[in-house]
Amino acid sequence: VPTLVFNIAGTGSGKTRMNLRTACTLRPNDPRICIALNLRSLTLQTGDALKKSMNLSDDELAVVIGDNITQELFEKAKKNQGIDEDENPPEPIFDAKGDDYDIPAWLNPLFEKTTKKGIISDNDGKTLLASPLLVSTIDYLIAAGEPHKQGHHVKALLRLISSDLILDEIDGYDPKALIAVLRLVQLAAMYGRHVICSSATLSKTLAISVHRAFESGIAMRQALLNDDKQAFNIAIIDNEIDSKNPPKIWQQTLTQDSDTQADDKNFKDIYQTHLNELQLALSKKTSFRLAELKPMPKATISDWQQAVLESAQILHDRYAWQCQNGEKRLSFGLIRVANIHHAISLAHYFANHWQHAHIACYHANDWRINRFYKEQRLDTLLSRHKDGKKRKTGNETIEQDSEIIELMKHSQQKNVPFVVIATPVEEVGRDHDFDWAVIDASSVQSIVQTAGRVNRHRRETIHEPNIIIPQFNYRHCKNVQQQKPKQPAFIYPGYESYSQDENYPNHDLAKLLPWQNNQLIIDARLRFDKDNCLFAKLDDREIQGFCERYFYDEGDELFSNAQVDSCLMTEQLYQTFTPLRDRQYQALYRINPNSIKEGELAIEKYVNAFNVALEKDGCCGNTRKYYMKTLRAVLNKAIKEKEASVSTYPFGNGGFEISKLEEKHVKGICWLRIWT
């Protein structure tokens, strides 16, 4: 019987291993499993960890990711690596690691490549299809549920048809990407496979969406097999509720006359009951993360920067600790900023206003090799587990590090803060333990996930807040400064206006979060408690409002309606409205090539003006130089060809493009887009 499992175990509790054991328990005689992750290099980490902890051999496990560079870097530093994915990267190719396999002869034509030397076998493709356990970026499997290059679509579909599906950290997808993932859930159910979804903050709204997708897949299976009824199991498990209480497991049956609304209500009630029990269990446990609100007199960028700086200084004073020699104090702090340009700008601000602090800016647009070595240092320094013997405090690695020793030795100050200013790349998948954090909030999820990087390994008892949240986030301050205070502020990343219903009633975190005496305990309860946390309620409203168009009875049911809409045969629904990877543009600049006279002087005027615009947006000097160089080439090409043809130039994990708009009323007008 197909089974849908929700695993809501806490962070660091071994969810990945439990997911695999659950899948093997559900199908003990012939386990074939796909573990799909949204994190490219974390896919490698997961594969390696499972291989060691579950004692798997190369002929039992295959790992697939999107590029060779990440694979090579990981292999060189396997012991220390634990990487999260960056903002919406492209996934152009897939590289597989694992033993070669034989497949049935009738499948061989699908796994052949034509080269100059003739037809050769695609051994990587065979590995992906035939291995018993596949650990993969979800980009590989996503083609099974949407129009794609047909060879890739068929290969991914064959793998999905023959495997049970594990979706780790399923709440890490934005609503558009979530719909793409739910199509996989629907297909897996249609082919009678088990689906296991896990996350420490798996909200009721998300669980309902997954349940609706699975239920619609079962309905498709019922129609396909022409059965009078089709049953499936549902289970909810976690590690927090008293082990004396068995996990919630029940069976739902679809018939020709099924009342899906009654079934859905039953699911909602049971899931909510479980969340209530989970919140009660969490409330009885010691809290290791306490947040404090930082009031702001005005919502301006300068006030926001000042508030973040003051917060960091306060937290350093609270949580700095003495080195072994006892002469100087240090701390490692995290400042979470929503977007790359804002993070870079804040790093410059800190460097100018807190000069004895050591600042590292960690973001997705850094050169790959730079980012890798930053991660290596952070992974080494911020692994702060205690063992009661050689590692009594968890700070031993930092105190014994030669670079840290030199920096402390040459510092003229008694207090030496080490500050990482990071974008959301730090939120998920990084096994780091910071002393404190300042959070530029984008959603409740961003607060809970970032807080999970504070006091993570040492789990010290705290008496004062070790996290500070400014009253307003950067984007709202920018909107106010531009006299657009009602513009969405919790976006890119964030959920505000996703369902296109209405904006949030306000952007004041003093009102959106359930503070008590200006303080707030941060754990999974904050994400689940929609009754007391307005922020969580609004986030869930947007997620549900978007998802119900595709799977809910209340919406259009584009992907679950028995009466198939013809739009399902078009690519736009998949690639434009519900893509897995949606490029979020950082900036949009208007250019009219017809107004540029041929010659270097006129081009330089455009380039210089663009340079000023980028600088105002907080773009750093080296980045601007790169953009300027490429912009000159683009403009020269536009003038030479008498039109603005599409040109793409890579920059780290991003790039930009100049393109001609087709509408007659803006003919000849071009737009320069920069994305990450």
Task: Give residue spans per PLM region.
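N-terminal helicase ATP-binding lobe
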Residues: 1-676
